[in-house]
Amino acid sequence: MENRTYTADAEPGETVTVAGWVHEVRDLGGIAFLILRDTTGQIQVKFEKDEMDDELVETGLNVARESVITVSGDVEEEPRAPTGVEVTPETVEVLSEADTELPLDPTGKVDAELSTRLDNRTLDLRSEEGQAIFEIRAEVLRAVREAFRDANATEINTSKIVATGTEGGTELFPITYFGEEAFMNQSPQLFKQLVAGSNIERVFEIGPIFRAEEHNTPRHLNEATSIDFEGAFCDHTDAMDVCEQVVTAAYEAVAENCTDQLEALGITEEFEVPETPFPRLSYEEAIERINATGELDEQLVWGDDLPTEGEKALGDDVGGHYFITDWPAEIKPFYIMDHEDGELSTGFDMMHPRMELVSGGQREHRREELIAGFEQQGLEPEAFEYYTKMFKYGMPPHAGWGLGGERLLMTMLDLDNIREAVLFPRDRQRLSP
């Protein structure tokens, strides 16, 4: 829009044209106020009824909330106004009239159920809180990319349509691909390993993953954003170091560049950048500490995966981000390298006190051992021939991890439900919008 001024840039003494949504109208008799909202904030528009054209006043005061308008006029200093300035209008033009009955209140004065908010996402994102979450999300992804570049990693984009699942199993969305069965990719794991085996060496990807899991919890999605790293000539400890750097960089960027957004969410004082290095607990130590809390009905034994209540008990005990290392080889994927004893793997998880954020480890780069890993987990190596054949041509030791982008944001901002961190979430019940 030509000659438009954002509300945050309107200065006393200027003649401006501002455009946005009608946030609120207050009629006090001889004088009335309209609050106009745009992406940068709000500005007050003053109507002095006895001194203005009747048609101008009627247009400004009878327009429904959330209608889209432009206002042209002079900016004056007014300490009592929400932003210290106000506009005396010369013209008001209604660009799009809103219904008088709205499915939710973007001002936040009336609470709405999450399902109502997601069904009416455009309206929901007009709230300060909704806008703040996704501005912070954008800053997180910007900082993550910068941290990866600082770690000498190159951004890649891998296929999301595959012939076989990354980890086998049934948690795949099947599709028809020119008459053949194919699947939506559940992870870029195998692809990023193949690229790390080239001269590029260190790679990262930020992209969607699809998992046909029938979970219906506040922390699971069927389409999510995965932040992935893979590095040649890296072991599992190197990968954990990069993970710490990336996660900490995201927090630091938000703390420095998103103070207004954090204030809108009411978490300015509670927001803390994680201390490094993150504690590193072995799987065995994790089980011992969980059992010692007495929070579980039954004691965990070697080989058990950690239940949700166990993760929570351990998170409360540790009190910050931490790693769990040296998992039993039998409960980690086939591509994770084992330690020399064969009982423990190089796999690790990075945890927030509320939940798991990252899964990673050193990968098996020796072809014969990799094939054996397939067979031990009941997978057919022939189905992954495109992957295994590249290990015949010299595959360096390599390690990496995958981080759930929405989980990172959810835990960073203490959101109640992971769906709040997604524009248009996909779960078992939601396919639209």
UniProtKB/Swiss-Prot annotation:
Keyword Cytoplasm applies: yes
Chain residues that bind Mg(2+) 2: E356, S359
Region span, Aspartate: 189-192
Marked site positions, Important for tRNA non-discrimination: P82
Swiss-Prot/TrEMBL keywords: Aminoacyl-tRNA synthetase, ATP-binding, Cytoplasm, Ligase, Magnesium, Metal-binding, Nucleotide-binding, Protein biosynthesis
Catalytic reactions on record: tRNA(Asx) + L-aspartate + ATP = L-aspartyl-tRNA(Asx) + AMP + diphosphate
Binding site for Mg(2+) 3: E356
Compartments where located: Cytoplasm
Cofactor(s) named in the record: Mg(2+)
Biological process, per Gene Ontology: aspartyl-tRNA aminoacylation
Gene Ontology CC annotations of this record: aminoacyl-tRNA synthetase multienzyme complex; cytosol
Binding site for L-aspartate: E167, R211, S359, R363
Cofactor binding annotation: Binds 3 Mg(2+) cations per subunit. The strongest magnesium site (Mg1) is bound to the beta- and gamma-phosphates of ATP and four water molecules complete its coordination sphere.
Binding site for ATP: R211, A212, E213, R219, H220, L221, E356, G404, G405, E406, R407
TM regions (residue ranges): none
Family matches, as InterPro entries: Aa-tRNA-synt_II, aa-tRNA-synth_II, aa-tRNA-synth_II/BPL/LPL, Asp-tRNA_synthase_2, Asp/Asn-tRNA-synth_IIb, NA-bd_OB-fold, NA-bd_OB_tRNA
Keyword flag Acetylation: no
EC numbers for this chain: 6.1.1.23
GO MF terms, alphabetically ordered: aspartate-tRNA ligase activity; aspartate-tRNA(Asn) ligase activity; ATP binding; magnesium ion binding; RNA binding
Family, similarity comment: Belongs to the class-II aminoacyl-tRNA synthetase family. Type 2 subfamily.
Role of this protein: Aspartyl-tRNA synthetase with relaxed tRNA specificity since it is able to aspartylate not only its cognate tRNA(Asp) but also tRNA(Asn). Reaction proceeds in two steps: L-aspartate is first activated by ATP to form Asp-AMP and then transferred to the acceptor end of tRNA(Asp/Asn).
Subunit description: Homodimer.
HAMAP family (alphabetical): Asp_tRNA_synth_type2 (MF_02075)
Protein name, UniProt field: Aspartate--tRNA(Asp/Asn) ligase
Organism the protein comes from: Natronomonas pharaonis (strain ATCC 35678 / DSM 2160 / CIP 103997 / JCM 8858 / NBRC 14720 / NCIMB 2260 / Gabara)
Gene this protein is translated from: aspS
